[in-house]
Structures are given as C-alpha cells and as structure tokens.
C-alpha cells in the first residue's frame, strides 16, 4: 500500500459516502494516506464500507462548523467533495448552507489547523450553457439554476482564500460517471428498452469524466505544487454529442440507438408546469427543467490546463467507460437479463 512513503499524509474527505468521495477516499488510502471521512451516519452501509477499507470515520454534518473543525484537526490535506445536488425537496437556503457556507467552514478550519493542501470540488456547471465550445477556465460564469449558483458562491469563497495565500486548488469536473453511480441508470434503461427519445437535434455537446480519471485529477490537484492557487477543469480528453453518447450506451446494452428526434419546446413547457405544480407540496416532480437541459445545454470543455500544468491524462475513453458502467449495472441487476430489480 505504500504506507511507509505517505504515512505522514493525513487526508480528510468530505462527501466520502457519496459516489466521487468514496472512490477518492479509497484511492487515497491505497496510496498510503491516513484517510478520515466526515459522515452523518457511521452505521450506514456506505460508511461501513469506508471503515472496512481502513478509513477513519468521524461523525458530523457538513453544515456544522464545529463538526468540520473537529474533522479537519491534525489533517495535512482536505478534499472538500460534499455538496447537495438538485432535488425538489430542498429550499434555496439549504443549497446555500451546504454548497456555500460549508465551504467557508472548511476553509476557516483548514487555516486554523495549518492544513498543507486544500482541494475544493466545484463544478463545470458554474459556466452554465456554454456559448462557444470548448470552454476553458477563463470562460465567463453563467450558472443556470440554484445548484449552479450555490456552487459558484462556494467556489468564490475558495478563490478568495487562494488569493489571500491559502494553499487551495479548485477542480471543476465535467459530468462524472462510472461504476458506483446510478444517476445515468435511467438513460441506460430507457435506451435498452427502446423508450428513450431524443428531444432536439441531438447535436448538443456533452462532456463526461470517468470516475477513475476524476479521482486522478483530484489527487493531482492536492499533490502537485503547480496546482496551488489555480482552477482546473477535469474531464475526458474530448467531448461528444448527445447522439454520440446515446449511441455508445446503445452499443453497451446491445441495441440500436434511437433515430427519432422530437421537438424540445413542448417538453420544457411540461417540465415547467410539473415543477410549479409539485413544489408547494414538496413533491419531486416527474419531470424537471434540469432534465430538459440534458437535451439543450452545451457542455464541452478544454482540459489542456490540467494536462499541461499537472500532467493530467485521462485514461478511460468514453466507449470503455460506458461499457464498464453497463457491466456494473448488470452486476447490480439493474439491466435486462440480470435477474434482479433495482431499488
């Protein structure tokens, strides 16, 4: 494991029970770091898997400044991955508390405890719908929803700390996918069963990052001297189109890709109506405007800065990553022929 080489490196990972955070925590442990995870429920299944992997658990909530301070104590590295994502059940204030205020708590605690390196995980979504592709780290901000706005507010705190001399690095991932994540399951399932429909022309740009490459980028941001004070987009070597992504998924599940393209405006109107009807009751609407953005918002980025300055090199091309993800879904029983039913 190399513990003798990195025994003095102690890393806190927030969001370690989530998809990206769990992969990162295990990767750091494999490199020889002592890894600590801030978790709300140490008895939860994901937390238990961390503990089984030799990761220290400390109980607390990411929105609790005192809990964060205790978690940061005696750490040399902090990887702040925790965030709240898009659901209809959270208020705008909750997004701000977790995606902005908690960043401040992490930065303040890291400063108090003399942490050597801090990595803040932002999102490429701070750029919103990209007008000219590929975008880069200097592209104007254009957040399109409360999640993106709150993530931008958190990143601004990290940038401010970096300008003040804190050893902060900021990573903006493109769409993260791979084994362990079920956010793309609906796409795989509907393509497999023939019910997926492409709204719009299908030529909108789409940029993904396989989880192993994402973890490599995060670790480089936390270790490479050139990363301090900088912002890096992390993603695959190249972007694709929506039609290209769907074609890869179809290949991985063994079906022909859909050829029919439907108009997107009626779908957006339906999504808007669903959200307004469901929000007063705290119900997660069956259709979100954010889901419609999947068909309309361009997301394509250059990762040249990370490659040139950090030596970042994506290793898993889209076709391989999609195939690996499909295989994991099969193993979980979530695709046809696997004999199980998804939770």
Question: For each predicted feature, which ranges?
Answer:
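N-terminal Rossmann NAD(P)H-binding glycine-rich loop of SDR-like oxidoreductase domains
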Residues: 11-31
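NAD(P)H-binding glycine-rich loop region in Rossmannoid oxidoreductase-like domains
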Residues: 44, 55-101, 109, 124-129
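Short alpha-helix in the Rossmann-fold core of NAD(P)-dependent oxidoreductases
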Residues: 98-103, 119, 150-151, 207
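Conserved Rossmann-fold NAD(P)-dependent oxidoreductase catalytic core, especially the SDR/UDP-sugar
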Residues: 104-147, 169
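Flexible, glycine-rich beta-alpha linker
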Residues: 128, 166-185
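Active-site Tyr-X1-5-Lys
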Residues: 144-169
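Substrate-positioning beta->alpha
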Residues: 149, 153, 181-186, 199-222, ...
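Mid/C-terminal beta-alpha module of Rossmann-like enzyme folds, strongest
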Residues: 220, 224-287, 303, 319, ...
